[in-house]
Amino acid sequence: LAVSMTLLSLLLGILLIHSRKTKEIRIMSETDALTGLYNRRAAEDHITRQMQEDGRNPGCVRPLISIDLDKFKQVNDTYGHLEGDALLIAVADTLRTSVRSSDIVGRIGGDEFVVYLSNVTDRQNAMAVAEKLCQVIRELSTMKKEWSNISASIGISFADHPNIKMEELYISADKAMYSAKENGRNQYQTL
């Protein structure tokens, strides 16, 4: 009986460790190592699921925001990659704290980020969030002299029909973001 209890305890311990490690591996596979945000694949997966859920509510406008930092390359080239990394971490923290916990924030790569605003029924609310994100990212430029030229070009797209795919929504948001860049940067545009 004592041997059986010891073996059972050992087995339960192994299962607990396995469960924890499995969870750690899943989190690591979904997380951008530098910023702690969702990585591209995980962001796409979570946004796709949330879009499907929001699509059941006919009033949801399902906005996706694409963000590209203006003059980020200048920070990297002038002050080095460690300073660029510090800026990316600050931007990620700023994005995370500037939206609701139900919204999805991810780093697509380099200095590109996405934000999906869940359960939004008014386009004006989404545009107000985009304006706020422009402002809070611009405020980072006052934190360090190395970041003095930082701002963001932001594009917003809306899922106008129920069958739109996340990839299509992202392409539209990205086009709007490039329009913001071409029209002077430090602003948002919609498509």
Give short role names for the model-derived ranges.
Residues 77, 116-121, 138, 159-160:
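Residue-level recognition of strand-loop junctions within catalytic nucleotide-signaling folds
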